[in-house]
Amino acid sequence: MKNLYICLTDFQILNALNLQLSKFKNKKADLFFITNKEGNEQLAERLATTGIFEKIYLFNNSRIQGLHQYVRSTVEGKTNKGFAAALVTSVNEAVYKLRSKFSGEAYRINAKIVLGGKMDFAAYDEVFCLDKRSLVVDCVTQILKETSGKCKINLLDEGTSTYWRSILKTNFPISDIYLYAPELANYYAEGWQERIYKIPKIDYSDEKFRAVINKVFDFKDDGNYPYDDKGSLFLKDKIIFFDQNWDPMPEYFKHLNKFMMLLLHNPYKKHKKESAFYERKMQMFRITADNSGGNDVIVKLHPRSPLSFVADYQKSKCTMAPNLKIPWEVFMDNCRFNNNIWVTVSSTALCTYKMIFADSREDIPMIFLYKIVYDGNKSYQEDDQFFKGFQQKYPQSVFIPETTEEFAQIYKKLITKMNDKRKDNK
């Protein structure tokens, strides 16, 4: 029997590597993930070459280039494969969905695996995952079916949302939970202490692990940053804005006639809500970039954000962080930071700087803007519980403004401190 890691994000893949090379180094394992961003096919190949996992399964979760995409690209004036190809794709997808209803979970999964071959669902006695998509539920359901319910189903840290009580409402029974900072989970004191296990923190002196994750995620020094006296990349006197991947309103929705607006009513409503988050996020970025006091502003693009976001960011003075498509945690393991300010809506990447590393690091001031961006459009109760707990643990460096004016005031004070520190270091 062996472990199976079902990963929806690169951060979960990083955590699977960490667990498999520490707690489970004497146990066989497979890894399953999806084509939800560009480059995941190459990522799967690099994972396979490490030999850490017996099998790497890659599930085709890419957007269907069917009739909907054909209409969208035609309205936007973009190239496409033509109506006939789009029709065939849509028909094939309809057949797949219909057959899946009759053939069950095993077919639904295996029919779209593009690397690794067919899964042996009976091979596992432990699964590590998070119940966030129907695909995960299907996979776990089939495993429980073929193991007569004997397989342990564990939840694996996937960022801040894993610390919310809502993750306990799953479509399958939970055995254990693996987290970096269990005490920050808002359900920790509700009878879960004995079932939450700490993921080993990443040791900055562990060069073997760094070599593994650098290879897997294809981390390279592109020459943008200097090194410190210990041989680490060094980011000094920087303001970093962490992107999150809400999409702006697609161009084709801005030019629809009344008939098409009626036909596409539901997707229009969805895009309208998401684009509101995008616009507020960009408003916060403009404040960050336009009031930097002459300091360098860097944007860390979300791994799943399209490169088309770059042009919008660069309307303000900024540079884009290198290695855009790798987890920030990999970059942090290769880098030291001095006199930084980090700003985001609610990105996990800031929290992991303080949560997942074993060594003591500079206490970087961090500003979380979710109360401003989500206000009126999204409930943020569980975000708030987590980030308030995070703030209580790091009261001198975590800031959660409630208004744009408060953000501007906090930011101005931090810029003054940054400039004073730079002068003192000269």
Q: Model segments located where?
A:
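Donor nucleotide-activated moiety binding/catalytic core segment of transferases
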Residues: 304-351, 355-356
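Active-site and donor-binding regions of nucleotide-sugar-utilizing enzymes
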Residues: 4-182, 350
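Catalytic binding pocket for nucleotide-activated donors in carbohydrate/polymer assembly enzymes
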Residues: 350-413, 417
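Conserved catalytic-core segment of nucleotide-activated headgroup transferases in glycan assembly
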Residues: 238-305
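A nucleotide-sugar donor-handling region in carbohydrate enzymes
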Residues: 156-252, 256, 260-261
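Short acidic-hydrophobic, aromatic-tinged amphipathic segments that line or gate anion-handling sites
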Residues: 56-59, 319-326, 395-407
